[in-house]
Curated annotation (Swiss-Prot):
Residues 23-1356, 1426-1487 are lumenal. Its main location: Golgi. GO terms for biological process: Golgi to endosome transport; Golgi to vacuole transport; protein targeting to vacuole. Residues 1378-1404 are cytoplasmic. It comes from the Eukaryota. This is Vacuolar protein sorting/targeting protein 10. The keyword Repeat applies. Glycans are attached at residues 300, 324, 967, 1265. It is a multi-pass membrane protein. It comes from Neosartorya fischeri (strain ATCC 1020 / DSM 3700 / CBS 544.65 / FGSC A1164 / JCM 1740 / NRRL 181 / WB 181). Gene3D superfamilies: 2.10.70.80, 3.30.60.270, YVTN repeat-like/Quinoprotein amine dehydrogenase. BNR repeats lie at residues 61-71, 378-387, 438-448, 479-489, 721-731, 816-826, 1104-1114, 1145-1155. SMART domains: VPS10. It is found in: Golgi apparatus, trans-Golgi network membrane; Prevacuolar compartment membrane.
Length: 1487
């Protein structure tokens, strides 16, 4: 019995052992699945083994068992098969995912792919923006974004759903997409703003008038733009809106937006915690440039940002913010980046404070011949200090984000403390293919070699299993370790594959891995392996199998503190023969508190770190307790400047208490006193004989940091001077070097080039703080051509046009190209005229487009041809064989060429796309058989004003001003007898900042001056308030500056033939910068002239000004004065012109009162009065010469001390204590309607004792639209204005061919019988008086369509009529303004049947008329072309001398570059169209 029992017992024991042995496997279970198409994207649903996979053919597959079995997903109607373009996982809801279709049908699952529901959106999923934007609090709220494109142009249309796409509603059309304010669950956490932020949406929308990136605005709505289609603009900086918004993104508890102004690459980053209070991020004086920053993985209490410092070497600086994202501290320099902005930076998962970073060791030597030497380092204290990675005593370097070969995190996973990477030991990082696999199980403190060669790797079962697969070509085996990478085992695969992806569940708690690869044999078969390690251990880990592991250790090997606590994990011991086997249960950290220390505190709001980083100093004056600080020597108890970092859990007892109040000196609270007087500072130039005309302001743009006001200038002796404080102090950085010319960078206001008379030249890109020299290939040209041409987008791209063979009788010019600011040069063309880059925003693919004039067959006796090329003239296209001159302005290229039918006459041809040109046709009632000269004046109101010379007889030069329709193809007469000078320049000037206001001088005695004899011109000044539709004389003021009556008077506020105000215009100015108006001082104009029957001589002139855009005028001073505006018009300075003085006058109330100020102890002749081009400074600079000593001097006059505070602007309200709403108006209209709408501007009240302190372009809004009146129309083609204001057909001319539109557009259904009128291009009026469309008729053979069309509803009829009209007109820029005003803003939800689509104001058709090629006349302010030019071209004669030829000094601010001088710089030779085309941002002046 006992024996039998022993036998049975032994048998059972053997059986149990056998079963145990069978259960414990040595290899994982591998299950392959084959697919005909490559897996495109896949992801796990969190806390499940459910996988969703999209293949490249558009099919969708799912697996519920970790990839062992797959099934194709389809909907009942079969639409999902081959219909899924991309899949998206909801980042905040583990149950939801989205499958976006290739068409307009999409799908959503709310149960982890078990079931799917379809939904439709009227648009394709966006490709340039995120197609889905998720709400951080409510997973049922999603924004869907689509790209609607025409050709290469796309706009972003956003839709929203609040119920998981059961319903979808249009949100709005935008320029940069929309986002939920709550973009992350942590946003506004604990702020009790749930009701306020629940539905808030932020969108990047275009400027009110300008569809360019630098005008984009950030607006929000709390009701999906239902109640207000425009939305509310966010006050981002100092309580005011910011333009130039490029991007906006949620980063955990932060919301960040970036803005960039025109004329700079510097970005301003703004951060908010609630979308209400915004702060500009301060990087300690470091610039953040466009495409030069990367938001990195951030913590709950700070942001990490890497800022590009060297584009050539792709290196940066890593910054870490304080808890509110306002102040950033520099952590690591020379971080390694790639050209896409990826940075070698990663935090170790789930462990606070450990960061791996790669830096460039030889950052200062990286170039074309020197490769980067990348080294790796690690921080255990949140980036405060870094140390090397070590394998024993050797340094280890690992490949990081920029060379990552898998998906997910690079080094770590939620497996506590386990870190892996591919790299090498030695001096620096080698190629990825030369690397090996290394592992650390103490969070990077120590490392060991794991496997030879590069591998893809993953962690499973909280680190109990590590799997790797070779990443060096093909393989048929995998490697795995179950002891933290100390020992490795291999297992064969069924196929030999190219591994593409190795992954597992996101929390790394599963024992199943997924390997995706392509078979080596076929290359078209794709395999997905499910690799299950469950059988390798037979038991589950118990308590004794775990250890308490400290996540961070200090330099002494002790647990370290961060954010007030130490962090520990219970993790499986490396040698434990068990699996944790707790799927989807993340390792939980254990926190133990620490005593508060220095590291637990940060600078409080309005405090910044001191230079040594050991204290916090006030960033703004402190407010002392009431009754304290009566004297500066007093003290008071105030804030220390420190605060405990929010979220920090340190124990205060026994620790540091840095945030307790401290005794502070009262000097910390006393701001710079308002001394109630001006400050003048004179600088004398003893060795200089004269100032040259070359002086330039390198003005900071709105997004630029810093506060210097830099001026650079030349003396007549070629001495170069720089001032960084607006002329208070000057220095000579290139003393001893004779500079011949200063060439400011027209697209980059921080840069300038200095040229000598030989090949030596200099550049600065940091606002003249430093200069670097370069050698040009040849000396500057001697033909009056621009020496340098600049690329609008790439600031380092240059074209140099220099002189060749001038000492040997064949003097000509050659053009060279440089991509690196003159370091290297390549020959473009020989025997050239002007060469320019023609890249523009509205010309996609034009980055390399260059235009050049070249003498045919490289012989100067031949004609100048106009060529273009997109490959540096490896090949080229000839556009014109006899191009006299060409110029570019805004989106247009205009060419003056010889008329083939009349060689003595000029013709103009225009292109928008830079590839196809068409001739511009002039109106028949301007009968000039031989067009010897014409001048293109302006196009800022989306129509071209052109002056056609009628007479070029010396002393009788004049012509007719004609105005184009919106696409430049049809011109009508606007005004006759406009005066010009012998050089072709016209007394015509647009008022900056206001639509449609222009001033011109006409000759009242044309017939007399045309007769032989000494009769002089009698000029009268006229003004238009509706863009040339109507002109009137300037109304004279009632009294002069002394309160006396003038010799004549008028009634009713109108000027008369015998009594009106006349102003000296552009052609009489000593300095072309002295324009009447300013782009920032809205409504203000100043000028010198007289009241009477006509304009008298300058010696009889007085000084006048207007505050209402030219409606009324007042005399401010007897005599001639120069003027300048400051602080956007809140201060005006005038100084006598060319007579000895030591006194200037200033007004702080828009000219109501004038105060004298003695700026010099001795009398001076003042030649020039200047300030920054935007007129936003409170500093002014006088340039002159002392009368007695004859010494040159500059005097800075500083007004900043006169007032203490900044004005308070309530942008979204109506008015405030400091501002009122001002509406421009027409003098003979009662409703303030101009161009079909009422514009409103915030203007400072003259009585307000404050400063504007704002550098942004002037903010304005469209208050309302108006019904149409006669003022919204102008005379049609072949019609001319009559004395009673009506339009009549020119005698002998036919009516316009109405049927032409039908012939040109075969799909057109109807046409309109021509009338005498057409709409002014920029009007936005709706309804009311209809003068241009009275009778419609069907196009031939379109009778049925016509009948069908006119049977539709009123709204549909409106669209059916207007859309063809808009298309026929060429879809120019005016449509942008027209449709914007008519509908206010896109109301996508109002009527799905009349959805504006591509005809909305943001539409590329409307804003970018790239398809319009024919007949658009150039947007050039001054383009004089004289008959002499033809003769010179034929004879080969070129005049080299210069008279008043100089570059325009105000080449600094993008949005204000055109406000000073409606003519760009020109050389004195009249055969030059434009000398410096720096005003090509003309259309962008006003946002």
């Amino acid at each position: 019995m006992i024996t039998r029992w022993l036998l049975i017992t032994s048998f059972l024991a053997l059986a149990i052992l056998s079963l145990s042995s069978a259960a414990k496997k040595s290899e994982p279970e591998i299950t392959p699945s084959s697919f005909d198409n490559e897996p495109f994207s896949l992801f796990y649903f969190e806390d499940t083994e459910t996988i969703l996979m999209n293949t490249r053919d558009g099919n969708l597959f799912r697996s519920f068992d970790g990839g062992k079995g797959w099934e194709q997903v389809d909907d009942p109607n079969g639409k999902m098969k081959k219909g899924v373009r991309s899949i998206w996982q909801h980042p905040f809801d583990k149950n939801r995912a989205y499958a976006l279709g290739a068409n307009r049908r999409h799908w959503v699952t709310k149960d982890q792919a078990k079931t799917w529901e379809s939904f439709e959106v009227d648009g394709y999923a966006a490709t340039q923006h995120e197609p889905l934007i998720f709400h951080g609090w409510d997973s049922s709220k999603v924004i869907f974004q689509s790209d609607e494109c025409m050709g290469r142009f796309c706009i972003v249309k956003s839709y929203y759903s609040t119920d998981d796409f059961k319903t979808v509603s249009p949100l709005r059309v935008s320029a940069g997409g929309c986002a939920w304010a709550v973009g992350h669950p942590q946003f506004a956490e604990g702020l009790n703003l749930e009701d306020e932020l629940r539905d808030r949406v932020l969108c990047i929308v275009p400027g009110l008038k300008v569809p360019s990136a630098h005008a984009n605005r950030l607006v929000y709505s709390d009701d999906f733009f239902r109640s207000d289609a425009e939305g509310t603009e966010l006050n981002i900086q100092q309580g005011r809106p910011v333009s130039g918004i490029l991007s906006a993104a949620a980063v955990k508890k932060f919301f960040v937006t970036a803005a960039k102004s025109q004329g700079t690459n510097e970005l301003a980053l703004y951060v908010t915690l609630d979308t209400k209070a915004w702060h500009r991020a301060d990087f300690g004086g470091h610039r953040v440039e466009q495409d030069g920053y990367t938001l990195l993985e951030s913590t709950n209490y700070s942001m990490q940002v890497d800022v590009l410092t060297s584009p050539s070497s792709n290196t940066g600086i890593l910054f870490t913010s304080n808890s509110n994202g306002t102040y950033f501290t520099r952590n690591v320099e020379h971080t390694n980046r790639d050209r896409f902005g990826h940075v070698d930076f990663e935090k170790i998962a789930d462990i606070q404070g450990i960061v791996l970073v790669n830096t460039v060791k030889n950052w200062d030597k990286v170039g074309s011949e020197n490769e980067k030497k990348v080294v790796s380092s690690i921080s255990f204290d949140d980036g405060r200090t870094f140390q090397s990675l070590k394998v024993g005593d050797k340094q280890l370097h690992l490949h990081s984000v920029t060379t990552f070969a898998n998906t997910g995190r690079v080094f770590s996973s939620p497996a506590p403390g386990l870190v892996m990477g591919v790299g090498n030991t030695g001096d620096h990082l080698k190629k990825y293919s030369e690397g090996s696999l290394y592992v650390s199980d103490d969070a990077g403190v120590t490392w060991r070699h794991a496997l030879d060669g590069p591998f893809k790797y993953e962690f499973g079962d909280q680190g109990s299993v590590i799997m790797a697969v070779s990443d060096k070509g093909t393989t048929d085996e995998i490697q795995f370790s179950i002891d933290h990478g100390k020992e490795w085992h291999s297992t064969k695969l069924q196929h030999k594959i190219y591994p593409k992806l190795l992954t597992t569940t996101p929390d790394s708690t599963s024992l199943t891995f997924l390997l995706v690869g392509s078979e080596e044999s076929s290359g078209t078969k794709h395999v997905v392996y499910s690799i299950d390690f469950r059988g390798l251990h037979e038991r589950k880990c118990e308590k004794d199998d775990f250890e308490k592991w400290a996540a961070r250790l200090n330099e002494n090997g002790e647990p370290d503190c961060l954010m007030g606590h130490q962090q520990f994990f219970n993790r499986r011991k490396a040698n434990a023969d068990c699996f944790v086997d707790e799927e989807f249960k993340d390792p939980q950290p254990i926190f133990e508190p620490c005593k508060c220390s220095f590291e637990d505190f940060e600078c409080d709001f309005n405090f910044v770190r001191s230079e040594d980083g050991k204290s916090c100093v006030p960033a703004a004056p402190l407010v002392p307790p009431v009754g304290r600080c009566q004297k500066q020597t007093d003290t008071f108890m105030g804030p220390s400047g420190w605060r405990l970092i929010p979220g920090n859990t340190c124990t205060r007892e026994g620790g540091e208490n840095l945030d307790k109040d401290v005794e502070r000196p009262c000097k910390d609270v006393v701001s710079a006193p308002s001394h109630d007087k001006l400050m003048a500072q004179k600088q004398v130039f003893n060795d200089a004989r004269q100032f040259s005309e070359q002086y330039y302001y390198l003005e900071r743009q709105a997004s630029s940091s810093g506060d210097d006001e830099t001026v650079i200038m030349l003396t007549s002796e070629g001495e170069f001077w720089v001032s960084h404080d607006h002329g208070k102090n000057w220095e000579q950085p290139l003393k001893g070097v004779k500079i011949a010319a200063i060439v400011p960078h027209p697209y980059y206001s921080d840069g300038a080039f200095l040229l000598t008379r030989d090949k030596q030249a200099f550049w600065t890109v940091d606002r003249a703080y430093t200069f670097k020299s370069f050698e040009a290939p040849i000396p500057p040209n001697q033909e009056g051509l621009p020496v340098l041409s600049f690329h609008p987008q790439y600031k380092d791209w240059l074209i140099w046009t220099g002189a060749v063979d001038c000492a040997h009788g064949d003097c000509h010019s050659d053009a060279y190209f440089s991509k690196n600011r003159g370091e290297n040069w390549d020959l473009l063309l020989r025997y050239v005229g002007k060469c320019e880059f023609e890249s523009r925003e509205n010309r996609p693919g034009s980055e390399k487009l260059i235009f050049c004039q070249q003498y045919e067959n490289e012989n100067k006796k031949n004609h100048l041809q106009l060529l273009s090329s997109e490959n540096l003239f490896s090949d080229s296209h000839v556009h014109f064989n006899d191009a006299i001159r060409y110029a570019t302005m805004s989106e247009y290229i205009i060419v003056a060429s010889r008329d083939p039918d009349n060689p003595d006459s000029l013709v103009a041809s225009v292109s928008v796309d830079g590839r196809t040109f068409a001739r511009a046709e002039f109106p028949p009632n301007v009968d000039v058989p031989v067009k010897t000269a014409f001048t293109v004046l302006d196009s800022s109101t989306h129509a071209v004003f052109l002056h056609v010379t009628v007479s070029d007889v010396k002393g009788a030069e004049h012509g007719s001003i004609i105005k184009s329709n919106s696409n430049g193809t049809s011109y009508v007469l606007s005004l006759n007898a406009a005066s010009r000078n012998e050089w072709g320049y016209v007394d015509f000037e647009k008022m900056q900042g206001l639509e449609g206001v222009a001033v011109v001088n006409i000759i009242s005695n044309v017939e007399a001056v045309l007769k032989k004899g000494p009769t002089a011109k009698k000029l009268k000044t006229m003004i238009t308030h509706n863009d040339g539709g109507q002109w009137m004389l300037l109304p004279p003021p009632a009294k002069d500056a002394d309160g006396k009556n003038f010799g004549c008077s008028v009634k009713g506020g109108k000027g008369s033939g015998q009594c009106s105000l006349h102003l000296h215009g552009y052609t009489e100015r000593r300095d072309p910068r002295d324009t009447f108006s300013s782009g920032s001082a809205i409504g203000l104009m100043m000028g010198i002239g007289n009241v009477g029957a006509h304009l008298s001589g300058k010696d009889e002139a007085d000084t006048f000004m207007t505050r209402d855009g030219g409606i009324t005028w007042k005399s401010v001073k007897k005599g001639r004065y120069m003027w300048e505006y400051g602080d956007s018009g809140s201060v005006i300075v005038i100084v006598p012109e060319l007579r000895p003085t030591k006194v200037l006058y200033y007004s702080l109330d828009e000219g109501d009162n004038w105060e004298p100020y003695e700026f010099s102890e001795v009398e001076m002749h003042i030649y020039r009065l200047s300030t920054v081009p935007s007129d936003t400074s409170k500093n002014f600079l006088l340039w002159g010469k002392e009368v007695e000593s004859n010494r040159l001097a500059t005097i800075n006059v500083d007004f900043s001390g006169l007032r203490k505070k900044s004005c308070n602007l309530v942008e979204n309200g109506q008015e405030s204590d400091d501002y009122y709403l001002w509406e421009p108006k027409h003098p003979f209209q009662e409703d303030n309607c101009l161009f079909g709408h009422v514009e409103q501007y915030h203007r400072k009240k003259p009585s307000s004792q404050c400063w504007n302190n704002w550098r942004e372009p002037h903010v304005h809004s469209i208050g309302r639209n108006c019904t149409c009146t006669r003022a919204d129309y102008e005379c049609n083609y072949n019609y001319e204005p009559q004395n009673d204001g009506s339009c009549a057909l020119v005698p002998g001319l036919p009516k316009p061919d109405a049927l032409a539109v039908c012939r040109e557009d075969p799909d057109r259904v109807e046409y309109w019988e021509p009338t005498a009128y057409r709409r002014i291009p920029q009007t936005t009026c709706a309804g009311g008086l209809i003068l241009d469309h009275v009778v419609s008729k069907p196009c031939p053979s379109k009778e049925k369509e016509y009948e069908k069309k006119h049977g539709i509803s009123g709204t549909g009829l409106f669209f059916a009529i207007m859309i063809p009209i808009v298309a026929a007109a060429g879809v120019g820029y005016y449509v942008y303004a027209k449709w914007d005003g008519k509908f206010g803003q896109i109301r996508l939800g109002e009527n799905a049947g009349t959805y504006e689509g591509l005809l909305s104001r943001e539409s590329p058709i409307v804003t970018v008329p790239i398809a319009v090629i024919a007949g658009i006349v150039a947007v050039i302010r001054a383009l004089p072309l004289l008959a002499m030019s033809l003769w010179r071209s034929a004879s080969g004669y070129v005049r080299l001398g210069r008279n008043r030829a100089y570059s325009r000094p105000y080449a600094s601010r993008g949005s204000f570059a055109a406000r000073r001088g409606d003519y760009t710089s020109v050389v004195d030779d009249e055969d030059e169209l434009l000398g410096v085309d720096d005003a090509e941002i003309d259309e962008d002046d006003e946002l």
